[in-house]
């Protein structure tokens, strides 16, 4: 787990925490591009992640709501956590993984290098595989973060690696626009792991 801090300039001074949790390992072939595909996660690893999270979340008893991506692999973990914490569960499409278009369901190694090169050369604007651009991902995550500030309360988000990286990028750069693929966060949150985000609203 790693803590990040971001302070937006607003009229208030209330600090809130967001738990950004990645789903457990999905039941897919290694190296598969699965983005928006609705695949399940390993149930035993999901339960293990839930146990690990409960130990950490016991320190944040004030959390009243959990938001989850609507994909099966995230809802498996979200449902367990919501039941164990006895808090509200809300499905949020904006928390879904990036849409990789026609390349979803293909192995990354089988995707033409020319397609990946075009994406990295126009990283903010190019819709990879005809799906979603990195800029579109960043803008919807920016909206989520703005909505979170307005709630003025700690939250749990059960989501995906791409969304977590988008949050990290926005926190480091202060805007939902990326100039180069080289600026994209390299650190990956492991399956079933999490980071926390402290925001001053």
Where are the regions that the model predicts?
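Short glycine/proline- and acidic residue-enriched helix-loop micro-motifs
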Residues: 116-135
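Domain-level recognition of soluble alpha/beta enzyme cores
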Residues: 174-201
